[in-house]
């Protein structure tokens, strides 16, 4: 409710260029430690996509509970939801690493330099391909530094990001560095705690 209020408030005062304005989105609570209590902000455009994602997931939960058919969002909307989650993965990996929940960085590089990357292939409508920086959120993900590949269906990836499928249960094609694949699956699942 507070998130929705902040989104509407920001839009009503913003005017042109409002999609880039930051929207307060609560505080980091888990895992405890460094970073806990920090304010989370998302650009308005991303906050709207995140809110649409939450509404879709909750509506799907209700539909399943009453055995009512409920389709996923239109492909272009699903793509935006997947894109937001994929863009959040490098920072989430870094947070998990600082908390001891992910493997240590293997190859730190300067911000903007190409770093080790995982190719995330999302299949089905709304899918696409993203390269995820593994060792630093400031590194540039690239095909040349690909060390692992992870393929998931778009709806399955969203269910993983929503905490509705565990990383172990996610139906995924995997290749390359197993530790990197594992860390990305767990990072995706931890997005549900935002």
Label for each model-derived stretch:
Residues 13-194:
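Structured surface interface patches that mediate subunit assembly and partner/cofactor docking
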């Amino acid at each position: 409710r507070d998130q929705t209020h902040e989104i509407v408030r920001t839009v009503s005062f913003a005017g042109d260029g409002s999609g880039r304005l930051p929207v307060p989105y609560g505080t980091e609570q888990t895992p405890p430690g460094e970073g806990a209590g920090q304010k989370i902000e998302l650009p308005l455009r991303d906050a709207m996509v995140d809110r649409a994602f939450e509404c879709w997931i909750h509506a799907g939960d209700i539909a399943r509970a009453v055995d009512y058919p409920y389709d996923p969002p239109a492909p272009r909307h699903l793509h935006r939801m997947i894109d937001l989650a994929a863009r959040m993965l490098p920072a989430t990996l870094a947070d998990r690493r600082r908390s001891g929940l992910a493997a240590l960085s293997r190859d730190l590089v300067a911000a903007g330099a190409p770093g080790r990357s995982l190719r995330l292939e999302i299949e089905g409508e709304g899918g696409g391909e993203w390269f995820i920086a593994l060792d630093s959120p400031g590194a540039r993900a690239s095909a040349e530094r690909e060390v692992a590949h992870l393929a998931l269906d778009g709806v399955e990836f969203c269910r993983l990001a929503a905490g509705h499928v565990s990383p172990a249960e996610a139906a995924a094609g995997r290749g390359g560095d197993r530790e990197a694949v594992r860390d990305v699956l767990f990072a995706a699942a931890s997005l549900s705690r935002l």
